């Protein structure tokens, strides 16, 4: 970086332990600085006179990340990964985020070939409030069929869920959305828009319970509810018939009809090889159920 008059020499970035950099002094229209990072990527930082900062990083594999941050705190990040998938995250000055991602045919094909999920090139932060939860619009290639997709989440927990936003505005928790170490995973059959929420329940009797993570997982998805808004009763027992019903509900089985309330769930469990259908009234611990489902 060239020294500014009267300010003395500015040390080279490499001498300070970072990558090399070059640029020009501040002008009425702003400043531009380019840095070569230790991993070989190159970052170009442009600062406009109004305080807007645009940072663009180009990696050795050709992928790029461009983030524009305005003085009011709003920002837009655009990503294109090496497979050709793209993603954009817009965050307004109040912190409300919306994201869009288009997954490339190459990314989908490679993931399916390896038995993996396609990771979307966006990252959002889950919210406990549906009104402020980030929305993510996911575009899949035509004729992609059922595709496992991972949406990176900065604060993922066992109670983090994807919520499907239908075209009419109604919302539905995706029961099979699964938290991973750094994302939420769901299976999609075509393009869709989802919200990412922390739907964990605050049960006072599970805060220090050994099955807390499992209980957070199942209660957030409505698979096993508490006996009230604040009590889960993890040590209470339930029956095998109730467990069959929970499992069938998790898999969206049709449980209408039947001569007794659990008959359809019992038949479903037998058909799937989950249970022999015996002893429907035998007891099982609610904490054990949660762990089994988790």
Region roles according to the model:
Residues 158-167, 183-294:
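N-terminal propeptides
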Residues 1, 5, 23, 36-172, ...:
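Long, contiguous ectodomains of secretory-pathway proteins
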Residues 173-179:
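Solvent-exposed serine/threonine-rich low-complexity stretches and specific carbohydrate-binding patches
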Residues 3-30:
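Short, polar/proline-rich extracytoplasmic segments that appear immediately after membrane translocation
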Residues 8, 14-16, 83, 98-100, ...:
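Intrinsic disorder/low-complexity segments
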């Amino acid at each position: 970086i060239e020294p500014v008059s009267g300010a003395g020499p500015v040390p080279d970035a490499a001498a300070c332990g970072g990558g090399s950099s070059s640029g020009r002094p501040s002008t009425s229209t702003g400043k531009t600085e380019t840095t070569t990072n230790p991993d070989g990527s190159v970052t170009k930082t442009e600062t406009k006179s109004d305080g807007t900062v645009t940072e663009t990083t180009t990696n050795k594999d050709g992928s790029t990340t461009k983030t524009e941050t305005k003085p009011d705190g709003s920002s837009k990040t655009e990503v294109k990964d090496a497979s050709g998938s793209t993603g954009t995250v817009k965050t307004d000055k109040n912190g409300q985020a919306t994201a869009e991602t288009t997954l490339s045919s190459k990314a989908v094909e490679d993931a399916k070939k390896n038995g993996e999920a396609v990771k979307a090139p966006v990252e959002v932060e889950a919210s406990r409030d549906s009104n402020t939860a980030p929305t993510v619009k996911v575009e899949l290639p035509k004729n992609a069929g059922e595709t496992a997709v991972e949406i990176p989440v900065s604060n993922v927990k066992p109670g983090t869920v994807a919520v499907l936003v239908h075209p009419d505005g109604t919302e539905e928790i995706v029961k099979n959305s699964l938290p991973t170490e750094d994302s939420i995973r769901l299976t999609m059959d075509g393009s869709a828009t989802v919200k990412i929420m922390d739907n964990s329940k605050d049960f006072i009797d599970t805060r220090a319970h050994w099955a807390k993570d499992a209980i957070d997982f199942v209660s957030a998805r409505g698979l096993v509810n508490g006996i009230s808004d604040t009590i889960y009763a993890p040590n209470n027992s339930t029956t095998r018939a109730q467990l069959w019903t929970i499992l069938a509900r998790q898999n969206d089985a049709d449980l209408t009809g039947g001569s007794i309330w659990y008959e359809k769930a019992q038949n479903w469990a037998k058909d799937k090889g989950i249970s022999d259908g015996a002893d429907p009234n035998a007891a099982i611990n609610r904490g054990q159920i949660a762990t089994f489902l988790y």
